[in-house]
C-alpha cells in the first residue's frame, strides 16, 4: 500500500512466528526491513522494551532480532509527554490501571506515535493483534478507532504490502 506508514504493536511482532509459515517469514522480515529503511515502519521505544521483556532466553526470537536490527530506522520519532497526556485523556482505559508491573505499557505510545504522524500529514495505520475489549480495558484496536486511526492485524498488513 503505497505511502502508508505502519506503526506496529508488539502483539503483532510477537505473533509473527505463530501466524506465518517458515516459507513466508523471511519475505516478511525482508519487506519489514525495506519499509523501515524507507521510513514507513515506525515503533515507539516502548514496543522495543516490551519485546525485550517478552523474550525467551533459551529460544531464538526472530522478531526481537529484527526489532533490534532496525531500531535506529524505526524509533526515529517519539511522542511527547503532552501528546501522551492527550491520548490518555481520550482513551486512558487502553491501559489496565490495576496492573502494577512497574513497566510502561506500549499501547498509549503506539497510539500517540500514530496520531503524531497523522498530524504530520502521513497516512498511518496501526498493526496490532489486540482486538478484545475487557471490562476495565479497551483494546488497542478500539482505542485507535476512537482516535480515528485505522488499525489492521498482521494478516491485513501482509495483504496490503503484498507479502505472501
Give each language-model segment a name.
Residues 3-6, 10-124, 133-134:
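Active-site-proximal, substrate-binding regions of enzyme catalytic domains
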Residues 120-125, 131-164:
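Acidic, PIN/NYN-like endoribonuclease modules and their adjacent C-terminal/linker elements
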Amino acid at each position: 500500500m503505497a505511502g502508508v506508514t505502519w506503526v506496529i504493536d508488539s502483539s503483532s511482532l510477537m505473533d509473527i512466528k505463530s501466524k506465518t509459515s517458515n516459507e513466508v517469514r523471511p519475505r516478511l522480515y525482508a519487506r519489514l526491513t525495506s519499509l523501515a529503511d524507507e521510513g514507513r515502519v515506525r515503533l515507539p521505544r516502548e514496543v522495543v522494551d516490551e519485546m525485550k521483556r517478552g523474550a525467551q532466553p533459551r529460544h531464538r526470537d526472530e522478531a526481537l532480532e529484527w526489532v533490534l536490527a532496525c531500531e535506529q530506522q524505526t524509533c526515529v520519532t517519539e511522542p511527547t509527554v503532552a501528546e501522551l497526556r492527550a491520548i490518555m485523556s481520550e482513551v486512558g482505559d487502553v491501559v489496565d490501571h490495576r496492573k502494577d508491573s512497574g513497566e510502561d505499557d506500549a499501547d498509549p505510545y503506539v497510539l500517540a506515535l500514530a496520531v503524531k504522524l497523522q498530524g504530520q500529514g502521513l497516512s498511518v495505520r496501526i498493526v496490532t493483534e489486540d482486538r478484545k475489549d475487557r471490562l476495565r480495558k479497551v483494546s488497542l484496536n478500539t482505542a485507535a478507532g476512537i482516535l480515528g486511526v485505522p488499525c489492521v492485524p498482521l494478516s491485513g498488513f501482509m495483504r496490503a504490502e503484498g507479502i505472501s
